[in-house]
């Protein structure tokens, strides 16, 4: 009798353990971040982790792809071998989306891309592929609006009084959809508002503050240094690097970024940065987790959420931030 009771207890424990393991596996989501030390992706990673805790019952297998697509490809293979029920992928190279989809598709695993848009063709190639991100055109237009607003309100910004903005532009990663589109539309929006522009320098800072500082330092050491009136940056990380360079040269120039990083907001409050565009990491993080969790459980991607899908894409809106509305965003 005693032996039977012991065996029953062991069997119950094994069954309970199996059920717990099964539950964990059912909610196991593999995540790859293109590189952990990117300013904005560091925020995104924290928001994803925070939302997973709020939702509950999720085990995140988080990976740093170290800005190498080959590493990310290997990470996806390992995640699939560990039995993840969904993938959340921040691509290193958007052109690699078909490779990731091929891996996920062979195991019938849903994949939610985020931050780097794989493009409609890639999403359309697999019925369980989704994208959470923004409309980069919107960020360029809003940044252009911010610059135009301050340019028109402050005639002193026109250093040579020619009615034209002489600008330099720090571009993100070449080929990255956000970098290409922000660069195009910020200038188009300025021109559409009747402001003439003249590009003095443009170069990639690869989203990186240190690289951006070096670029701006070179520009401020050139023969055109005194002609620069505005510094435009595809993200706040590079804007912070630009600010360091201007300080080193004893110059104060209007600098505009994108992301609304906490440190950028503080610098706007001090008058050291002119403006930024909120890239909403909180809502993007929530959408990534909520879609991935639903898909991992075999549910509709947006079931029980506020997100709207169009062609299996969720777009989170941008918001312009300057000294006039800064109080709405400072925590």
UniProtKB/Swiss-Prot annotation:
- Gene Ontology cellular component terms for the protein in this record: outer membrane-bounded periplasmic space
Q: Which UniProt keywords apply?
A: Calcium, Metal-binding, Periplasm, Signal, Sugar transport, Transport
Entry remark concerning the domains of this protein:
The calcium-binding site is structurally similar to that of EF-hand proteins, but is in two parts, with the last calcium ligand provided by Glu-229.
Query: Hey, what's the signal peptide range on this chain?
Result: 1-24
Record family assignment: Belongs to the bacterial solute-binding protein 2 family.
Give a yes or no for keyword Membrane in this entry.
no
Can you name one GO molecular function term for this protein? carbohydrate binding
Taxonomic lineage: Bacteria, Pseudomonadati, Pseudomonadota, Gammaproteobacteria, Pasteurellales
Task: Determine if Magnesium is one of this entry's keywords.
Answer: no
In which residues is Ca(2+) bound? 158, 160, 162, 164, 166, 229
Q: What InterPro entries does the annotation carry?
A: Bact_Solute-Bind_Prot2, MglB-like_PBP1, Peripla_BP_I, SBP_2_dom
Q: Binding positions for beta-D-glucose?
A: 38, 115, 176, 178, 182, 235, 259, 279
Residue numbers binding beta-D-galactose? 38, 115, 176, 178, 182, 235, 259, 279
- Subunit structure, per the record? The ABC transporter complex is composed of one ATP-binding protein (MglA), two transmembrane proteins (MglC) and a solute-binding protein (MglB).
> Got any disulfides in this one, which pairs?
none
Query: Pfam families from the xrefs?
Result: Peripla_BP_4
Q: Any idea where this protein resides?
A: Periplasm
- Tell me the superkingdom of the source: Bacteria
What name does this protein carry?
A: D-galactose/methyl-galactoside binding periplasmic protein MglB
Q: Which gene encodes it?
A: mglB
Its biological purpose is as follows: Part of the ABC transporter complex MglABC involved in galactose/methyl galactoside import.
């Amino acid at each position: 009798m005693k032996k039977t009771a012991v065996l029953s207890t062991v069997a119950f424990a094994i069954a309970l353990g199996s059920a717990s393991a099964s539950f964990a596996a059912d909610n196991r989501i593999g995540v790859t971040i293109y590189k952990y030390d990117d300013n904005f992706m560091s925020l995104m990673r924290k928001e994803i982790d925070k939302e997973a805790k709020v939702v509950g019952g999720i085990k995140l297998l988080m990976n740093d792809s170290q800005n190498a697509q080959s590493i990310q490809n290997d990470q996806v293979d390992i995640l699939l071998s560990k039995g993840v029920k969904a993938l959340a992928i921040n691509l290193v190279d958007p052109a690699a989306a078909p490779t990731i989809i091929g891996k996920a598709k062979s195991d019938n695993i849903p994949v939610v891309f985020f931050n780097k848009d794989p493009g409609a063709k890639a999403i359309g190639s697999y019925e369980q592929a989704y994208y959470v991100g923004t409309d980069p055109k919107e960020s360029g237009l809003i940044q252009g609006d911010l610059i135009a607003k301050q340019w028109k309100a402050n005639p002193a910004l026109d250093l040579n009084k020619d009615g034209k903005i002489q600008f330099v532009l720090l571009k993100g990663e070449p080929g990255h959809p956000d970098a290409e589109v922000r660069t195009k539309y910020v200038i188009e929006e300025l021109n559409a508002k009747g402001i003439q522009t003249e590009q003095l320098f443009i170069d990639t800072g690869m989203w990186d503050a240190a690289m951006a500082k070096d670029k701006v330092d070179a520009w401020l050491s050139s023969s055109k240094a005194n002609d620069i009136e505005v510094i435009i940056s595809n993200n706040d990380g590079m804007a912070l690097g630009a600010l360091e360079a201007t300080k080193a040269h004893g110059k104060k120039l209007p600098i505009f970024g994108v992301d609304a990083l906490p440190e950028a907001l503080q610098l706007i409050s001090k008058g050291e940065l002119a403006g930024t565009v909120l890239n909403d990491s909180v809502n993007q993080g929530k959408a990534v987790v909520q879609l991935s969790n639903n898909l991992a459980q075999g549910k509709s991607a947006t079931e029980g959420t506020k997100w709207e899908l169009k062609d299996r894409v969720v777009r989170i809106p941008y918001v312009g931030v300057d000294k006039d509305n800064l109080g709405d965003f400072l925590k």
